[in-house]
Curated annotation (Swiss-Prot):
Component of the ADA2A-containing complex (ATAC), composed of KAT14, KAT2A, TADA2L, TADA3L, ZZ3, MBIP, WDR5, YEATS2, CCDC101 and DR1. CDD domains: 7tmA_alpha2A_AR. The modification Omega-N-methylarginine is found at R370. It is a multi-pass membrane protein. Glycans are attached at N25, N29. It holds the Pfam family 7tm_1. This is Alpha-2A adrenergic receptor. Belongs to the G-protein coupled receptor 1 family. Adrenergic receptor subfamily. ADRA2A sub-subfamily. InterPro entries: ADR_fam, ADRA2A_rcpt, GPCR_Rhodpsn, GPCR_Rhodpsn_7TM. The gene is ADRA2A. Residues 315-332 have a biased composition (Basic and acidic residues).
């Protein structure tokens, strides 16, 4: 978003330009090089070609990965959950960074001056801050959505409609715009010590101390702090609910941990529709929900415990299944509903055995419960393993976010308070921040089976017609 140059007059710096021989102007101007000769490029031909190739690969990888995310969400039924609209909006922001920002940053870097005129300079600066800030705020919104879906369980999942998600996305873009547009409103033209315009056209953003500090807080430090606190809280909840083995939990204790988990809802979100019974299964589904990346839905009803998710009823209800499996499910599903209809309003719900993992699973009798000790122990060990994997996912999500953006925003803030930062180091941190746009598709999809399956169908020509 911002680039540093050699020290400028009045403590300003050039946010987008490359190292320049003149260091006295903090505004855009269109004067020619002294003597009317050709401008000297800041890099040799070999270095320039290397930079162009690296930046070109970054742009291609960013566009390709994020386009795959968008296509997968809109073509795969298993990914049509409302919360996946966050991923679509995030991918769109990253694509815009790669197409409308990085190319001009690259040209400005290798040419050593701004070639594209004053009007586009101001638009470019605003778009740069807007798209990069939007990408970061999207990650923060995804973490909050995940936290609410866990702490409020069924209640929030019922409210998580496409309209609500779209409203949150609009809010994300509005916040990003509020952070991005002040530079245009308070854009000042400064001159060097001599009062003369510089020899090269330059494109620089507002370098006032108040804006540097406020934009750094709004664009990075505040969202980063929110993400870290939210994910720490999510991990604490998961750790507390998996510390005690299911054999030591009572039905009442388990039901009390998640609001609304002990009673059947009039909308059908009970055990028949992917909800879980009051014997510890809901806690296990919570843990598996945490095991995925933010915003990812779980596949519907497979036997694998990793696929259990409290959000099944709203996210993966239409997950892909072989044609024969749909017909074979009608019998057990109908039987399960018939048994549920026989439960009177005052009766307690039947307890589920340890093997009940999917939709319409049969209830367990006393004999099954007595022989289920080994299965419970196995599931307990599975939950411990999932907790470790969940820790790894959190480390990836938070670690990559901080590693990509913290160095830039930290050094950017240092320049506002007068601390000198080596220009080469600042440039490296600036481009390293752009890498986050290309890594988002990897971070938020590599741990999700539905995305991997959708990507395979998109990339394999023979299977394209079978995408559902």
């Amino acid at each position: 978003m911002f680039r540093q140059e050699q020290p400028l007059a009045e403590g300003s710096f050039a946010p987008m330009g490359s190292l320049q021989p003149d260091a006295g102007n903090a505004s855009w101007n269109g004067t020619e090089a002294p003597g009317g000769g050709a401008r000297a490029t800041p890099y040799s031909l070999q270095v320039t070609l290397t930079l162009v190739c690296l930046a070109g690969l970054l742009m291609l990888f960013t566009v390709f990965g994020n386009v795959l995310v968008i296509i997968a969400v809109f073509t795969s039924r298993a990914l049509k959950a409302p919360q996946n609209l966050f991923l679509v909006s995030l991918a769109s922001a990253d694509i815009l960074v790669a197409t409308l920002v990085i190319p001009f940053s690259l040209a400005n870097e290798v040419m050593g001056y701004w070639y594209f005129g004053k009007a586009w300079c101001e638009i470019y600066l605003a778009l740069d801050v807007l798209f990069c800030t939007s990408s970061i705020v999207h990650l923060c919104a995804i973490s909050l959505d995940r936290y609410w879906s866990i702490t409020q369980a069924i209640e929030y999942n019922l409210k998580r409609t496409p309209r609500r998600i779209k409203a949150i996305i609009v809010t994300v873009w509005v916040i990003s715009a509020v952070i991005s547009f002040p530079p245009l409103i308070s854009f000042e033209k400064k001159r060097g010590r001599s009062g003369q315009p510089s020899a090269e056209p330059r494109c620089e953003i507002n370098d006032q101390k108040w804006y540097v500090i406020s934009s750094s807080i709004g664009s990075f430090f505040a969202p980063c702090l929110i993400m870290i606190l939210v994910y720490v809280r999510i991990y604490q909840i998961a750790k507390r609910r998996t510390r005690v083995p299911p054999s030591r939990r009572g039905p009442d204790a388990t039901a009390a941990e998640l609001p609304g988990s002990a009673e059947r809802r009039p909308n059908g979100l009970g055990p028949e529709r992917g909800g879980v019974g009051p014997v510890g299964a809901e806690v296990e589904s919570l843990q598996v929900q945490l095991n995925g990346a933010p915003g990812e839905p779980a596949p519907a009803g497979p036997p694998d415990a990793d696929a259990l998710d409290l959000e099944e009823s709203s996210s993966s209800e239409h997950a892909e299944r072989p044609p024969g499996s749909r017909r074979s499910e009608r019998g057990p599903r109908a039987k399960g509903k018939a048994r549920a209809s026989q439960v009177k309003p005052g009766d307690s719900l039947p307890r589920r055995g340890p093997g009940a993992t999917g939709l319409g699973a049969p209830t367990a009798g006393p004999a099954e419960e007595r022989s289920g000790g080994g299965a419970k122990a196995s599931r307990w060990r599975g939950r411990q393993n999932r907790e470790k994997r969940f820790t790894f996912v959190l480390a990836v999500v938070i670690g990559v976010f901080v590693v990509c953006w913290f160095p830039f925003f930290f050094t950017y803030t240092l320049t506002a308070i007068g601390c000198p930062v080596p220009p080469t180091l600042f440039k490296f941190f600036f481009w390293f921040g752009y890498c986050n746009s290309s890594l988002n598709p990897v971070i938020y999809t590599i741990f999700n089976h539905d995305f991997r399956r959708a990507f395979k169908k998109i990339l394999c020509r023979g299977d394209r017609k079978r995408i559902v």
